């Protein structure tokens, strides 16, 4: 009879020095400041961290393997559950990869609606980051104010797609719906009001002595470290590298709108906070321009391509060919040509990209997601060394990770 061998958990094999002067502690995975099921194994010399090892996998759901057993359209709602704070960013990155694989060009109005959803989603993600980061450091008032404004933006998103968190708002070839009546007017009301709220946040934090003591020269990331560890988004721009995929490799209509790329050179937590605050304003600038672009677009919101995209509901109900084509797409899935593609996008947390390998069937042969939080979490191994235990939670909150896209 074969006796099964019990595999030791990998963290039991970590060669931490067992000395009287050192102490090993576990932060998480059940910890309110871990921002999810993250476990950090820390070796301390007094109050100073001398070794750190992130231990992930507590939320692993096998999403990439699940994709291989789903038709392409079926996987869209699953992407919501990666970075569940920015579901539309996940929806878009995946749809853009499939569209590139199929050679689909989406209608102009669909591109504008996608940009509106992405920038609203960026604002909600940044607001949640600021709220929880401030709460970790002790600024309770900012937490409450951020959630107040976030509710207004979530109402706008809910008015479009019916959901506040898991949007499933995009379709391969475009979007599911046109904007509701008076939607742009309500959005512009928010765009006019929100700058005053941002000023309130900055009045509370910018020159707050405790805030600056907890963020200045804390969690410093050099240019070299940011590049070596694959950092993207604000983690990269906060260290002096002015890189934004929306500018470097424009997608949708980002090449037709004017916006800046905020960056800082100090590389510490305070510098990243200032970059985030400026990004709010750039998103508002983009939203105002999208409202103008929308008015001059034709009404089509889905690409016309019977092989990959279903016809309109009216055609499906009245035309036999459209009904049959719709039936085949839903039961067998769209079938892109053989090949592989990688599409990078600028999510609120950094570079989010999907690699898809197609074998010509209705299901991807291989799907791989490149999520920013995964790379930033790995960086804790170097970033936390030399810091004090009291600053670990502040640094984790400042880096802005979400465990849903780390574990997948």
From Swiss-Prot:
For this chain, one GO molecular function annotation is: quinone binding
Q: Report the subcellular localization.
A: Cell inner membrane
Pfam families, A to Z: Complex1_49kDa
Matches recorded under InterPro entries: NADH_Q_OxRdtase_suD, NDH1_su_D/H, NiFe-Hase_large
User: What stretch or stretches form a coiled coil here?
Assistant: none
Supply the alphabetized keyword list: Cell inner membrane, Cell membrane, Membrane, NAD, Quinone, Translocase, Transport, Ubiquinone
Report the membrane topology from the UniProt record: Peripheral membrane protein
What this protein catalyses is: a quinone + NADH + 5 H(+)(in) = a quinol + NAD(+) + 4 H(+)(out)
GO CC terms for this protein? plasma membrane
Instruction: Please state the Enzyme Commission number of this protein.
Output: 7.1.1.-
Disulfide pairings: none
Quote the subunit structure annotation. NDH-1 is composed of 14 different subunits. Subunits NuoB, C, D, E, F, and G constitute the peripheral sector of the complex.
Q: What does this protein do?
A: NDH-1 shuttles electrons from NADH, via FMN and iron-sulfur (Fe-S) centers, to quinones in the respiratory chain. The immediate electron acceptor for the enzyme in this species is believed to be ubiquinone. Couples the redox reaction to proton translocation (for every two electrons transferred, four hydrogen ions are translocated across the cytoplasmic membrane), and thus conserves the redox energy in a proton gradient.
Family designation: Belongs to the complex I 49 kDa subunit family.
Q: What is the protein named?
A: NADH-quinone oxidoreductase subunit D
**Which organism encodes this protein?**
Campylobacter jejuni subsp. doylei (strain ATCC BAA-1458 / RM4099 / 269.97)
Q: Gene symbol? A: nuoD
């Amino acid at each position: 009879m074969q006796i099964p061998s019990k595999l030791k958990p990998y963290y039991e094999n970590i060669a931490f020095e067992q000395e009287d002067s050192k102490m090993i502690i576990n932060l998480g995975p059940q910890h309110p400041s871990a921002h999810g099921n993250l476990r950090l194994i820390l070796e301390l010399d007094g109050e100073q961290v001398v070794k750190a090892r992130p231990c992930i996998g507590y939320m692993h759901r096998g999403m990439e393997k699940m994709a291989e057993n789903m038709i392409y359209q079926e996987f869209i709602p699953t992407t919501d559950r990666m970075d569940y704070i920015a579901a539309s960013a996940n929806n878009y990155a995946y749809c853009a990869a499939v569209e590139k694989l199929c050679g689909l060009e989406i209608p102009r109005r669909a591109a504008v609606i996608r940009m509106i959803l992405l920038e609203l989603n960026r604002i909600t993600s940044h607001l949640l980051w600021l709220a929880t980061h401030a709460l970790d450091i002790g600024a309770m008032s900012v937490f409450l104010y951020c959630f107040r404004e976030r509710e207004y933006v979530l109402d706008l998103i809910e008015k479009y797609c019916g959901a506040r968190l898991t949007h499933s708002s995009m379709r391969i070839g475009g979007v599911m719906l046109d904007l509701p009546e008076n939607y742009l007017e309500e959005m512009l009301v928010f765009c006019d009001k929100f700058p005053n709220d941002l000023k309130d946040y900055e009045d509370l934090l910018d020159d707050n002595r405790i805030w600056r003591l907890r963020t200045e020269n804390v969690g410093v990331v050099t240019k070299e470290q940011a590049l070596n560890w694959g950092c993207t988004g604000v983690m990269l721009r906060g260290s002096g590298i002015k890189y934004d995929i929306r500018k470097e490799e424009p997608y949708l209509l980002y090449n037709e709108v004017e916006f800046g790329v905020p960056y800082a050179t100090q590389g510490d937590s305070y510098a990243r906070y200032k970059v985030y605050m400026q990004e709010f304003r750039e998103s508002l600038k983009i939203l105002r321009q999208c409202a103008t672009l929308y008015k001059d677009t034709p009404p089509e919101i889905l690409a016309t391509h019977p092989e990959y995209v279903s016809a309109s509901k009216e055609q499906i109900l009245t035309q036999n060919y459209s009904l049959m084509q719709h039936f085949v797409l839903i039961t067998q899935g769209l079938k892109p040509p053989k090949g592989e593609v990688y599409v990078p996008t600028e999510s609120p947390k950094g570079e989010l990209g999907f690699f898809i390998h197609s074998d010509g069937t209705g299901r991807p042969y291989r799907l791989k997601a490149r999520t920013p939080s995964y790379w930033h979490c790995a960086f804790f191994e170097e970033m936390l060394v030399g810091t004090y235990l009291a600053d670990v939670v502040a640094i984790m909150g400042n880096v802005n990770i979400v465990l849903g896209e780390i574990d997948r």
